[in-house]
């Protein structure tokens, strides 16, 4: 992958090749959070079911980042997850689910279904929406992000009785030291990453450089 930095001598932006993890923590750098192993714990709202993810506790409005690059497949209200985002990886084998986002302003500005996002991009903000058939309701007691990961080896597995959701607790532990640094532009109000990122396997550098 490559990271865009500003040359201190010329002041011009340049793309610098880099090596390492192509995945980021779902929590932006500098924001406190905590979690515990809760995969498989029982949930009772609506119907009895196991918890198919990991709850990450933090402060209201904490920026949420895309763990892996991919395409936004789901965006909007779900009575269980509240305001949520579903992102499919570029190879279409992983589906990332981010739920219980902030009331009123759950998403990063301009986020839309069909949009491609890079790993580490701000996609939304932590909240406590959900557990309501009515939209935009805070019915979750504790502010947190529900983060889930579904493995999809065949499209028939996307929505069925044999979906494969995995325990992401160890993944979040691994990514805790690899967080995306972000900041809010005081003029536009948009949240941007401090070091723009380009996955060279998914997007040609010359295309990214044109942005």
Go through the PLM ranges and name each one:
Residues 1-83, 119, 172-211:
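Surface-exposed, glycine-biased beta-strand/turn segments
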Residues 55-57, 64-66, 86-88, 95-99, ...:
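Structural recognition of the beta-strand scaffold that forms the well-ordered cores
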Residues 58-60, 76, 89-91, 102, ...:
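Short, flexible loop/turn elements at secondary-structure junctions
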Residues 64, 106, 155-157:
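Residue-level signal for secondary-structure boundary sites
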Residues 66-110, 134-143:
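Zn2+-dependent peptidoglycan hydrolase active-site motif and core
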Residues 115-186:
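Conserved, short, structured surface segments that act as functional micro-motifs
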